[in-house]
């Protein structure tokens, strides 16, 4: 089994703390459903540190949010945050892509957008199904929550997560217009 480096463990801790605390803040759009800017943390940290970090940040951070908020831990939604973080981290595995080094192309951005959107949809459907099957929640309530959460997460991903990740990569781009004279 691969060991997690100290740097990765620290990144997971910081990301989970940020995601957990920022997850307490959001705008209500449906029953128990919010637009939460914290989702951008999963995009940025997933792109920086990969799918395992994204998964753990989502799982730990969402557990922190639910614990501090005092409404109990909703495991389906905790797991969905992990799935979203995991999906966001796939981009980090692409050859030539690096937020840290500022190396990316349009294909990388498209890949992040597609894997992020697919991850959000899969995760939210999973959370809804979990709530119906395991938690015994009413179907009609969950349909509203799933639609609201999907729309909210897609908006946050496209308006905050993706642009912040691209901005970080651009700011780290190593380019110069200096030429070596012979």
Curated annotation (Swiss-Prot):
Keywords noted in UniProt: Cell membrane, Membrane, Transmembrane, Transmembrane helix
Domain of life: Bacteria
Compartments, as annotated in UniProt: Cell membrane
InterPro entries referenced in this protein's UniProt entry, alphabetically: ECF_substrate-spec-like, UPF0397
Keyword Cell membrane annotated: yes
Keyword Transmembrane helix: yes
Annotated membrane topology: Multi-pass membrane protein
A matching Pfam family: ECF-ribofla_trS
Transmembrane segments: 9-29, 40-60, 71-91, 114-134, 142-162
GO CC, any one term: plasma membrane
Family: Belongs to the UPF0397 family.
Protein name (record): UPF0397 protein BCAH187_A2708
Organism: Bacillus cereus (strain AH187)
């Amino acid at each position: 089994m691969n060991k997690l480096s100290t740097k990765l463990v620290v990144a997971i801790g910081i990301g989970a703390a940020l995601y957990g605390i920022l997850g307490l803040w959001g705008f209500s759009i449906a029953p128990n459903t919010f637009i939460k800017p914290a989702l951008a943390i999963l995009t940025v940290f997933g792109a920086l540190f990969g799918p395992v970090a994204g998964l753990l940040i989502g799982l730990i951070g969402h557990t922190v949010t639910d614990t501090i908020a005092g409404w109990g831990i909703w495991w389906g939604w905790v797991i969905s945050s992990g799935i979203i973080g995991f999906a966001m981290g796939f981009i980090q595995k692409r050859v030539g892509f690096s937020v840290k080094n500022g190396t990316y192309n349009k294909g990388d951005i498209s890949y992040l957008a597609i894997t992020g959107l697919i991850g959000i949809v899969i995760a939210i459907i999973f959370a809804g199904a979990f709530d119906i099957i395991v938690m015994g929640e009413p179907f009609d309530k969950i349909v509203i929550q799933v639609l609201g959460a999907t729309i909210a997460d897609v908006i946050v991903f496209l308006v905050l997560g993706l642009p912040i990740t691209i901005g970080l990569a651009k700011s780290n781009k190593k380019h110069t217009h200096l030429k070596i004279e012979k």
